[in-house]
Structure formats: C-alpha cells, structure tokens
C-alpha cells in the first residue's frame, strides 16, 4: 500500500513513522511505501530517511492509496484541494482543526475514504490521545487506525464541532494562560517558590520550548484566549466577596471537568 504525506514537519513525520513502524511489525512491510512531499525538499528527504521512505515532488503525478495532509491549519483547505486527486482510496488530514478540513475533504474526495486526525500532543511526547473524525471509513483508514493504536495511541472518536469547540479551552485558552503567566513572571530568589509555581513554571518551559508559529496558528484559528483574559481581569479587580465567588466557580468547573474525564476513561 502506498502512502503520501504532504508536509514533512513534526506531525507529518509522526504519521509517516507510525505507518512505517506498523508495516515493519506486520507482514505488510514489503508492501508498504511511505513517501513525503514538502515545500522544502531537504526536509522531505530527511523525513523519508528517518522512516525508510522516499521523497517526492509536491507536483508529482504519481498516485497513492492514501494521502495524508500534514500542513499548517491555514493551508489545509488549499492543500486538500490540490492533492485530493493523488489519493486513489483515502484522504486523511492531521492539521489540527477539523470542521473545515472535513468539509474540504468531503467536497474534494466524495467517493473516497476520509478521516481527520488530531494528535493531542507534540511528537516528542507520543504516544497519547488522538482525536478522530471518521467521515467515510474503509479498509485503508482502518489500517491507519490500527497503526496508530499499535503505536500506543488512544483513538478518541469525536465530531468536527465537538473537537473544534474543545480546542478553544484545551489549546487556545490553555496556551494563553500559560504564556501570560510566563510573560508576567518576575525573577524569584532561590527557595522562595511554591509547588504550584514550580509546576506552572515547568509547563511554561515546555510550552515555550516549541515553535511560536504553531502556537500563533492555534490562536488565530480558535477562540478562547479572550475568555482567559476576561477571567484574569475579573479576578484582579474583585473584592474579597467577589473573589470567593470566582474561586468557588473555578473549583466547581474543574471538579466537573475532572469527573467527566474520569467517567470517559473508564
């Protein structure tokens, strides 16, 4: 089976690597071909070398069983439209947003298998939860799901609307809160820290150790940061009574969210 990954960045390599690794562990190893195409040919070659695949031109007229779109969110729809004809059986994206890419894949490849995937982690933290929207299933997308599950990932089926709404809190709001904490923090003498401060500092270090362009795309795509800013302003301006009310609201919200997560994980 032939796979083309359009975009040889972090998530493209993650996807191609999972497909190649699963093929190597099964009888399909000799029959699986993973190719990468990227605007930077050196990046495509490096990704191909890392998984035992090959690099091809973005303008290739070769056909593949499955094409995975792994480009920035802002380029997803145009990439789907351009490369859909290359996919003979299945079209997949790992761009991070779901509503618009799913609609674009449905329009560009109405008679092919279609799945939208969103790994909810950086590739260096894999495996983890992978959000999945199955728009049209079949043997190729089933094999992709098997490969991701075999790599230790937990596949979480969702809908485009549910996913994109959740990302307002999970990504845009969370990143805004962490970056605001980091930006506002001042130097603290050794020994004058608390466990909460140290934990938040560790999270901030993790967030700020990645590509700022990725986080900028998330902020441009999803709402959520504005609600964090509004909540912070309310807390800063609150008197004692109002602060206690806000504190209780926050406590109840976190407790409810934790209970929901625990129930879903059972």
Region locations from a protein language model:
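Structural motif
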Residues: 2, 65-66, 90
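Short, conserved loop/helix-junction motifs that constitute active-site signature segments
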Residues: 83-88, 108-109
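Rossmann-like NAD(P)-binding element
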Residues: 58-85
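Rossmann-fold dinucleotide-binding core
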Residues: 97-154
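NAD(P)+-binding Rossmann beta1-loop-alpha1 motif at the extreme N-terminus of oxidoreductases
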Residues: 1-53, 62
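Short acidic-hydrophobic, aromatic-tinged amphipathic segments that line or gate anion-handling sites
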Residues: 54-59, 156-160
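An accessory alpha-helical subdomain
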Residues: 154-266
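Redox-cofactor binding/interface segments in oxidoreductases and associated redox assembly factors
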Residues: 67-69, 92-93, 132
């Amino acid at each position: 089976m032939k796979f083309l990954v359009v975009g040889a960045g972090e998530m493209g390599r993650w996807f191609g690597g999972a497909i190649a690794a699963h093929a190597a562990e099964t009888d399909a190893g000799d029959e699986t071909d993973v190719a990468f195409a990227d605007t930077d040919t050196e990046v495509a070659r490096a990704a191909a070398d890392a998984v035992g695949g090959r690099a091809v031109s973005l303008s290739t007229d070769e056909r593949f069983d499955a094409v995975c779109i792994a480009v920035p969110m802002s380029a997803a729809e145009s990439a789907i439209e351009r490369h859909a004809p290359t996919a003979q059986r299945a079209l997949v994206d790992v761009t991070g947003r779901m509503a618009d890419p799913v609609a674009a894949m449905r329009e560009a490849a109405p008679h092919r298998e279609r799945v939208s995937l969103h790994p909810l982690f950086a590739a260096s933290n894999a495996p983890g939860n992978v959000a999945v929207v199955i728009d049209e299933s079949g043997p190729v997308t089933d094999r992709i799901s098997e490969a991701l599950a075999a790599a230790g990932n937990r596949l979480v089926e969702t809908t485009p609307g549910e996913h994109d709404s959740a990302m307002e809190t999970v990504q845009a709001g969370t990143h805004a809160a962490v970056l605001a904490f980091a930006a506002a923090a001042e130097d603290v003498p050794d020994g004058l820290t608390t466990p909460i401060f140290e934990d938040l500092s560790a999270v901030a270090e993790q967030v700020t150790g990645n590509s700022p362009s990725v986080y900028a795309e998330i902020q441009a795509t999803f709402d959520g940061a504005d609600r964090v800013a509004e909540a912070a302003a309310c807390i800063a301006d609150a008197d004692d009574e109002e602060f206690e009310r806000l504190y209780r609201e926050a406590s109840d919200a976190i407790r409810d969210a934790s209970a929901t997560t625990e129930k879903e994980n059972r």
